Amino acid sequence: MNTGKITQIIGAVIDVEFSVDSMPKIYDALKVSETGLTLEVQQQLGDYVVRTIAMGGSEGLKRGLKVTNTGGPIKVPVGVKTLGRIMNVLGEPIDNAGDIGQEVSWAIHRSAPAYHELAPAAELLETGIKVIDLICPFAKGGKVGLFGGAGVGKTVNMMELIRNIAIEHSGYSVFSGVGERTREGNDFYHEMKESNVLDKVSLVYGQMNEPPGNRLRVALTGLTMAEYFRDEGHDVLLFIDNIYRYTLAGTEVSALLGRMPSAVGYQPTLASEMGALQERITSTKKGSITSIQAVYVPADDLTDPSPATTFAHLDATVVLSRQVAELGIYPAVDPLDSTSRQLDPLIVGEEHYNVARGVQSVLQRYKELKDIIAILGMDELSEEDKHSVSRARKIQRFLSQPFFVAEVFTGAPGKYVSLKDTIVGFKAILDGEMDDFPEQAFYMIGSIEEVRETNKEGL
């Protein structure tokens, strides 16, 4: 074990001087002897000084304090002992439930699996959310992004997905809270507890109020735990909320380390940092990692470098739109903007593909006709267009759905709709079978059978 001493402290950046023969390597974890604070080596400056980022608050530090090199990167506990626990970036428990007592620790910096170890993803993962299963189906072992601006429902959608998939899917889940609100982390913990799925979920939190080092590395901590489960032969779900905060923490660290900023003030290493994280989130011949990531879109601009860099790595993108939310339709998924590589007749089958494309084409036609309707009114449309508009408005409302995790706010019981029922429902609307039903009958409801049941008397 080699020791050095602190020579400079600038916020979260701490310089440490070592002797000639004991220079730490990049990404080595150092421990401040007096406070127990962990530092991660980012740069070697020359004159035997290394520049580090603190994995915690730097209050109470002073120049001259002794620092010990642990001789390797940050290591975190992995395995079944982490299930049902809340941990920080260093894998230390923060839920006041005692030691984790793990037998195995893994370093958070690892290489992505080799090309020959990878396994392609073609099997569908049913979520029970109509709009997602129909328009942008998820692949088991794929990567999904939930894109949206502030307050359009990314976290609520993610909580619903976790609840539905964790109950239906018997594998393990890892939730990595990156730079999000502490309140949401607390709500999430209690939601998992009440749904009786907490014993299958590992929770790793690095909240908004924590230093940039914690927020930058907490995604890697969660990913390392998921990789262990995958390599043990399990199918794992990895939830990251929010990838944008990961990028933002990287921007802060980059500026603190004195790097020249790139476009819109982001770090020059944005693409390589994102690639290093995303390439590790993959499925191998041993097991799979299905990843669902919330992506905040600054100022609702999808061309911003952060969301734009994330797009390249994903198999499916669920775009949450403010325009849809303004209509009171939740989940506020934009069916025309959301995409999935799985929406292919060879994967989902001809019927599913044709119904999904039919729904998109009717909604696109309605979008084109909106200006004419606003200026001239419905009467000026052809009979065919009137039918299209009527069906589009029913489809729009039928894409809404009551969530289990929102029951306390809405008072409406949540609904899980199977993929088969979803396809049957939208096909019935497209084929004109539901033309006699009022629009409002389709709002915030589960399957098409419920629409028929509740409106039997009215017809």
Curated annotation (Swiss-Prot):
It holds the Pfam family ATP-synt_ab_N. It is a peripheral membrane protein. It comes from the Bacteria. Its EC number is 7.1.2.2. SMART domains: AAA. Keywords: ATP synthesis, ATP-binding, Cell inner membrane, Cell membrane, CF(1), Hydrogen ion transport, Ion transport, Membrane, Nucleotide-binding, Translocase, Transport. GO terms for cellular component: plasma membrane; proton-transporting ATP synthase complex. It catalyses: ATP + H2O + 4 H(+)(in) = ADP + phosphate + 5 H(+)(out). Its main location: membrane. InterPro entries: AAA+_ATPase, ATP-synt_VA_C, ATP_synth_F1_bsu, ATPase_a/bsu_AS, ATPase_alpha/beta_chains, ATPase_F1/V1/A1_a/bsu_N, ATPase_F1/V1/A1_a/bsu_N_sf, ATPase_F1/V1/A1_a/bsu_nucl-bd. GO terms for molecular function: ATP binding; ATP hydrolysis activity; proton-transporting ATP synthase activity, rotational mechanism. Belongs to the ATPase alpha/beta chains family. NCBIfam families: atpD (TIGR01039). Produces ATP from ADP in the presence of a proton gradient across the membrane. The catalytic sites are hosted primarily by the beta subunits. This is ATP synthase subunit beta. It comes from Ruthia magnifica subsp. Calyptogena magnifica.
